[in-house]
């Protein structure tokens, strides 16, 4: 009986380790954020995890205040960034975290301090960097990340009354964790 109990605990521990560990070939991506004049205003590093995609958002020179941040459906960033299409929404859900099942590209607002600089990490469990999956940001026309002038109200369809698009970055592949020493993007 003691052997079975020990075997069960070892099996459970192995299963948990497999579920929560990051594979060595984790997919990485990056988006260089630029404003409408083409000036760099930040970067978004994306890393595939077992729980979804971890986005590390670093901005500098963005107007202080609350700004909507979304993954958009098209990998184009021609000013004024309407070329990025609507929010990434492969499942055709309504917009907003307050609507139940939100767009896959719906994200929490960014709260930019008076310095205009922010570094924050956000997990999006609704998207993937794995090509061929229905919720992959690497579909036929790619994807972009967009910062809006105003906050997302988390409910108004289709875009949360977030206002104009003030910064945009095309999501591009940047290898795997194995190519950067097995570490998350910096």
What does each of the following model-derived ranges do?
Residues 1-12:
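Bacterial N-terminal signal peptides that target proteins for export
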Residues 3, 18, 22-186:
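N-terminal leader/targeting pre-sequences
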């Amino acid at each position: 009986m003691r052997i079975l109990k020990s075997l069960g605990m070892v099996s459970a521990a192995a299963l948990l380790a497999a579920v929560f560990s990051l594979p060595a070939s984790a997919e990485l991506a990056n988006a260089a954020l630029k404003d409408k004049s083409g000036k760099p205003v930040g970067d978004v590093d994306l890393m595939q995890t077992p729980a979804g995609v971890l986005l590390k958002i670093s901005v500098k020179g963005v107007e202080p205040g609350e700004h909507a941040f979304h993954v958009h459906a098209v990998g184009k960033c021609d000013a004024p960034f309407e070329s990025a299409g609507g929010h990434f929404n492969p499942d055709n859900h309504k917009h907003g975290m307050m609507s139940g099942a939100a767009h896959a590209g719906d994200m929490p607002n960014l709260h930019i301090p008076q310095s205009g600089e922010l570094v924050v990490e956000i997990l999006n469990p609704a998207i993937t960097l794995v090509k061929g999956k229905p919720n992959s940001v690497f579909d036929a026309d790619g994807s972009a990340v967009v910062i809006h002038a105003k906050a997302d109200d988390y409910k108004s369809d289709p875009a949360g009354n977030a206002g104009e698009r003030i910064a945009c970055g095309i999501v591009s592949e940047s290898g795997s964790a194995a190519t950067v020493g097995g570490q998350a993007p910096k």
